[in-house]
Amino acid sequence: MKANLEDLRDSFKVGYEAYEASRKEANDIWDLYHNRHYTQDQLAVLERRGQPAETFNVVKLFSRMLVGYYSTIVNTVIASPVNPRDIDNATMLNDAIAHVFDDNRFDILGDQIKLGGLVSGVLACEVTVEDTGARDVFGRPINRVNYDYVNDSELVFDPASTQDDYSDARFLHRFKWLSKDAVIKAYGKRAVERLDAYYNYLNVDEADFEFNNNFEYTGYYRVFDNFLIVHSVMEDENGERWSCHWSEGVMLKKTRITNQETRWPYRIQFLHSSNVKEYYGVFREVAESQRAINQALIKLQLMVNSEKAFVQDGAVDNIDDFTVNFNRVNAVIPVKELAGIKIEQMSREILDQYTVIDKALDRIQRVLGVNDSFLGMAYASDSGRKVKLQQSATIMSLRYITARIESFYQSLGDDTAKLIRQYYTANQVIMVVDEVVGNRWIELNKPMMEFAGSFDANGQPQMRPILLPEVDPASGEIMEDEDGNIIMAPVNELETELRDMHFTIRIDASAYNDEDEKAQLMLETVMSGQVGQMMSQVNPAGFFQMSALAMKSMKTKYSPDIVAVLNQTAAMLGGDPEAQAQASQMAQGGQQGGQPMSKALKLPQNTNEGVA
């Protein structure tokens, strides 16, 4: 496969046709989620009947519930150093990763990605590095890692890929409509002259402008042109990776991907594994039950009057007057022949429709593995133990989703850490929002200073940075400024530089709910009992390590931060025998000055008792 228009269009066609059924299924589920499942003909029929297009949206109900649940799980990306000498650098890298997540407002963006994964089965995010336009004092660019949610309907996948994280794919296509101004900004003014506005040259339904926008943007005085652009990333037969922007028969932009360790600028994670080429979300088996509920609601609307009257010809003078009087709560209805009128109760049919709804909801809960206790709808007579067991059963059944979300976070964190290591080369100060200790600031790439050989007027030695030619992190070539001068940058202090450190990425998942109260109580009992007291007296450093392990098992929002503090304290005590002795004495209840407790002290005597 080569990075030319012919191969790109062929791979697009192959990928689209391979996953066409999955795309249509995902669109149907999205329509159910957004209450767009009624066609125009069906809406017209309901309007003629005077019925509302009512629905009990189960897809949206459980989507919000699952997204809300996973929002309570704090997935913390942890970069662990491979070499002990990189401990300080790993701390700075973790702070930089946290800054990137906060800067991209991932608390909101992450919920959007998780919703897309639940509905369509694809968790997708674009990860790019952009130049902020700012420069440090030495002229080096200050870069920023940027996240962007990607709708699954815009993506075309490689059918040869077999990995759930899409790591073995040969290509990925993303098509999107861009405004005229955006095209000029990205590709130049001449590109607009070579393109046709509102032309779907891909010949696929999802690529129609009206698919997501309903109509073309036409104002009173002008038409706002939009153009269909495809962004393709691929690996050619020589192992080189390319980023290609093309439209119809025009290659707008073709560049080599310079990310050294991240393969694609897109992070993909499929929610389910399958033996055929498909992807789907958690609501595949729920869709038909959702339609059954909607149909039952429509029938209930037709049965809003629980009685029907069968009138024989000639039994009443005026059928319209009879209808009006019959529908009144209290009415005197004149008739000619009472035997020609039959009243039939419809309550049986109404109960049947409610049974359909109840059974459908029960099937949906069983398919999703979600019980009433997890939904907060347990019976008041249920014991707390029963509720906890049922909630734990739901959490176990949702593990297949939890594992894929954690895998996505780990892959995204790994991409972020590697991009930071490659592109964050400028001297900059980053603010880290820490809810425990408040805001903190870290300085990346702090210049190493050397003695300049002179003193200032106050007798203080003058320092200067050690300058060397700066290398472009993308191309590996010597950097030059706008005037063609070589950019000289300082050698950085090793503790503040991330360029040469080695790390591994893991995920610390902590759910701050109270599902493990019993286990937490048992741990607290051990820590505060005789074993814990003896441990604090004999081995204070080990006691802090035990406390860190106990805190790690507690699913609270601040568990990772408290665990880090406890581990730091244990390390401090382990390397300082004097501090360890003082901690042991404090655990024994030592008095000031180190004097032992008096053995002659007794409880005060009760004056009402006789003296023995």
Question: Model regions: which residues?
Answer:
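Catalytic nucleotidyl-transfer cores of nucleotide-processing enzymes
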Residues: 239-327
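Sequence/fold signature of self-assembling virion shell proteins
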Residues: 226-231, 236-273, 293, 517-538, ...
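C-terminal anchoring/interaction modules
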Residues: 1-49, 125, 134-140, 162, ...
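Generic signal for short, ordered secondary-structure residues
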Residues: 72-80, 96, 104, 272, ...
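Short, flexible segments with low predicted structural confidence
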Residues: 68, 88-89, 264, 335-337, ...
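Extended, helix-rich architectural segments
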Residues: 1-242, 352, 356-359, 445-478, ...
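Helix N-terminus capping/helix-initiation residues
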Residues: 57, 66, 151, 177-179, ...
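Generic detector of short, locally flexible boundary/turn motifs and exposed helical patches
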Residues: 42-44, 87-93, 205-211, 258-260, ...
